[in-house]
Amino acid sequence: AAYTREFFSDNVYRYSNAGKYKNDPSHGRFDIPHAVVYLNYDFGKGWTMGSEIEFEHTGTGVSFEKEYEESGEWEQEVEKGGEVELEQFWIQKRFGRWLNLRMGHIVVPFGLTNAYHEPLHYFTVYRPEGEATILPCTWHQTGVSLWGLLGSWRYELQLLPGLDAMSFSRDKWIQKGAGSAMEFAVANKYAIALRVDNYSIPGLRIGLSAYY
């Protein structure tokens, strides 16, 4: 949980002169910016399942919102600014160290941040702006994955629904392409994602990812 002090007022006209009130100490906010729930289970005989549910700002719900374009009129909205995302929900069959078959909603390991998106794997509080600006982050889609370990190498090959090119932009490249305005992901085209990592040198990871 987090507590912050920031500018907020019920008087819409104060926003047109924010500099006048920049030192106003009377406003604060409690929030839970980010919470993640993991649930995994081992069925035995090589079968496992995994899931990851992410909550941002305590999730969605009904909230009141001030419309500044309508002279500060209050409106009741169905959604709050938070999010609830099912980032992973898959079942996996292990055939050996060298081959695992994973099916369901999976993370696409394109780029370093997506491949290692858990906060324990990077040093900053926020994800790197470079990747997060131009790539879906965290990039998760429903598909099939083959992955395994061969010596000091790790590979992963995925079959996925293709990105939505209508959501590409000049400023954010393919960032919005993994989303969908529907209740499902449109899969008129299919895509392949591949990632290869090498761990030959202790403490050093060298990787390459591709998407087609």
Regions found by a protein language model. Name each.
Residues A1-G19:
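Transmembrane beta-strand segments of Gram-negative outer membrane beta-barrel proteins
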Residues Y15-N17, L163-Y212:
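Surface-exposed beta-loop-beta
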Residues V12, V62-S63, S169:
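Short acidic, glycine/proline-rich loop/turn micro-motifs
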Residues A1-F7, P25-A165, N188-A193, D197-R205:
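Outer membrane beta-barrel
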Residues Y21-N23:
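Short N-terminal helix-initiation segments at or just after the protein's N-terminus
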